[in-house]
Regions:
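Short, surface-exposed alpha-helical segments at coil->helix boundaries
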Residues: 18-22, 74, 245, 249
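Juxta-kinase regulatory segment immediately upstream of eukaryotic protein kinase catalytic domains
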Residues: 1-31
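ATP-binding pocket architecture of kinase catalytic cores
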Residues: 9-14, 34-161, 169-181, 196
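Helix-rich C-terminal or lid/interface subdomains of diverse kinases
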Residues: 6, 42-45, 116, 226-232, ...
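Active-site acidic catalytic loop and adjacent metal/ATP-binding pocket
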Residues: 45-52, 58, 91, 186-236
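Short glycine/proline-enriched coil/turn segments at helix->beta-strand junctions
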Residues: 53-56, 85, 216, 241-244, ...
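Short linear X-Pro dipeptides
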Residues: 16-17, 27, 174, 179, ...
Length: 300
């Protein structure tokens, strides 16, 4: 029997609208019942997020699989926050399932900032060093009792072999369009790179939308739904997906990343990018163009 975890079926997402959120808030948190509710401009996939007044947000999982992260975030984000050099969301309240919404949910403070992008970052090297400093601090938090990789975070922080089947399917679809030989070599190197087995805290989804900027500088890190303790190589993927070449080098130096961890991090970036390229190939939208750009970065 294989010991490699299975990702399972694609989650069946449900929709959530502002009226549902108003009812949940009124029923469970009457002190906030009069506050206006409106969707956040750039919502995520795993959760529907709504402004609750001007200073809070309600965050509601879109599927049962994503709801597994609620208890973890409620338990651990207050532990992590005082040990990190940048603000992270700390829950203000935990909501319960209601008549027309079946999952636990959360209320958080609203953290100001705009999502990071290469165009918005003022100084790419400083941004990379600041991000590395945040991740270094996260890795230093005592992992005793922390959640290991599992269904709550799609096995981030575990073995890359969990994603081998997805990666191979993407490579087959992209054959003849990209340098799949190079991609296969990078993937094999990542799979063969050994982890030292020392559990460290990781974020699990260090990406543009989860890094907030103020005046071009990193000011907050959000969305810890995939966090846990295990192999932190998954957090290295951002070195290729967002950072410049100079920033990538500064990031690696600040974190003192060894060859094996770097190779696995490159593999995490490759998996996500290949899957996106395969899904969007032939499209002219921003997501497709960005995935092709990142694939070039990974191959250099």
């Amino acid at each position: 029997m294989s010991t490699i975890p299975s990702l399972g079926a694609v989650p069946r997402r449900r929709t959530v609208d502002a009226d549902q959120v108003r009812r949940l808030v009124a029923e469970q948190f009457p002190q906030w019942a009069g506050l206006p509710v409106r969707p956040v401009a750039r919502g995520g996939w795993d959760n529907f997020t709504f402004h609750l007044g001007d200073t809070m947000v309600a965050r509601l999982p879109s599927a049962a699989e994503y709801a597994l992260a609620v208890e973890k975030e409620q338990r651990w984000l207050p532990v992590l926050a005082p040990r990190l050099p940048l603000p992270i969301p700390v829950p203000l309240a935990e909501g319960k399932p209601g008549p027309d919404y079946p999952f636990a949910w959360s209320i958080y403070p609203w953290l100001e900032g705009e999502p990071a992008s290469a165009e918005r970052v003022a100084d790419p090297v400083r941004f990379a060093v600041d991000l590395a400093g945040f991740l270094a601090a996260l890795q230093c938090v005592d992992p005793t009792g922390a959640p290991p990789p599992g269904k709550h975070n799609w096995f981030r922080g575990g073995t890359l072999r969990t994603y081998d089947e997805q990666t191979r399917r993407a490579l087959a679809k992209l054959d003849g369009h990209v340098d799949t030989g190079l991609a296969r070599d990078i993937w094999k190197t990542a799979l063969d790179a050994r982890w030292d087995g020392v559990d460290r805290w990781f974020h699990g989804d260090v990406a543009e939308g989860n890094l907030l900027l103020g005046q071009g500088e990193l000011t907050a890190v959000i969305d810890f739904g995939t966090c846990g303790a295990g192999d932190p190589a998954c957090d290295m993927a951002v070195a290729w997906t967002l950072l410049t070449a100079d920033g990538r080098q500064a990031f690696r130096e600040r974190l003192s990343v060894d060859e094996a961890t770097w190779a696995r991090g490159r593999g995490w970036a490759l998996w996500k990018t290949l899957v996106t390229c395969a899904r969007t190939w032939g499209s002219a939208d921003r997501e497709a163009g960005e995935a092709r750009r990142v694939l070039v970065e990974i191959g250099q």
